[in-house]
Amino acid sequence: MKILRKNHPLLKIINHSFIDLPTPSNISSWWNFGSLLGMCLMIQILTGLFLAMHYTSDTTTAFSSVAHICRDVNYGWLIRYLHANGASMFFICLFIHVGRGIYYGSYALSETWNIGIILFLMTMATAFVGYVLPWGQMSFWGATVITNLLSAIPYIGSTLVEWIWGGFSVDKATLTRFFAFHFILPFIIAAFALVHLLFLHETGSNNPSGLNSDSDKIPFHPYYTTKDLLGIFLLLLVLMILALFFPDVLGDPDNFTPANPLNTPAHIKPEWYFLFAYAILRSIPNKLGGVLALILSILILAAFPLLNNSKQHGLIFRPVTQVIYWIFTANLLVLTWIGGQPVEYPFTMIGQIASITYLAIIIILMPISNTIENNIIKL
């Protein structure tokens, strides 16, 4: 079996990736979230496949087909709620995974980091088009508002919006193409995830100390397969608690009402995992400026390798930047809260302050704190 594992053309790839892979002996539970994201993706693809068997992407029947899945399909309610809450678990793992990458300096592996940013953007796109499919009030108005942002692009904006809508408003053509995108994107994400792993295994994984771990490696199996299994069981436990006891806690009550183009909800807002970016978008009075800030809020992640001027790897021995990092995390939570609030005083002002702080921490404060710590080392 050992000879086959090491020599077989296909098994050899699996062996080098998940069995005999040399791994740093000191990586903590924060490194579990990569495997948890893989697990989330598998859950989403499987539950999504079963939902697609019963869903109809037509404006007249989409809402009814989701109700039919919940009422008439065997365990349809469970599949639907696993899929909806699975998306939330996916984004929780994603935010922690990115947060760990920032804290421990994983952005130094620039190819892996940049493919990760592409994966993040594709996951956000998939979640957005997926949210439109149940064709409730928030689905319809969320799609209308977010796609309409493209009209801020000079010259081609209006044409581009109508091209994406497939008409002069969000309608049947939009729903059909969004379903097609939502079906195909997870498979593209899976392919990119393999490329992400490929680049990671080229350089080897980072570790909490930020030091070179070539002299102290252990095989991935059985040490980290066991550790990953524990993480997967805990993830499934939280997901099942959400799906079985609090299935609608992360959803929007407006989505229980079928889409009505003649009735606008009081507060249009996306799913909770987009609220931080939505808050940044709303905090700028100018439409084009808001769209640029929205894009920048994600693409700013690509600046981390460029702005890093520290002589140390990761934040483990850098108390000044650690404080700034946790302020950044708290600021992100404030933005998420503000994104779900109405556009009125004092929420608008808090949103503007938090948006400026978000960008200032990454572009100004972190490089300054790095310089301070570099000078402390010289003392």
UniProtKB/Swiss-Prot annotation:
CC cofactor note: Binds 2 heme b groups non-covalently.
Regarding the membrane, this protein is recorded as: Multi-pass membrane protein
- Give residues annotated as binding heme b b566: H97, H196
Which SUPFAM superfamilies does the UniProt entry name for this protein?
A: a domain/subunit of cytochrome bc1 complex (Ubiquinol-cytochrome c reductase), Transmembrane di-heme cytochromes
The entry's family comment says: Belongs to the cytochrome b family.
Q: Which gene encodes it?
A: MT-CYB
Summarize where a ubiquinone binds, as residue positions: H201
Compartments (UniProt record): Mitochondrion inner membrane
Q: What is the lineage of its organism?
A: Eukaryota, Metazoa, Chordata, Craniata, Vertebrata
Name-wise, this protein is Cytochrome b
What is noted besides the main data? Heme 1 (or BL or b562) is low-potential and absorbs at about 562 nm, and heme 2 (or BH or b566) is high-potential and absorbs at about 566 nm.
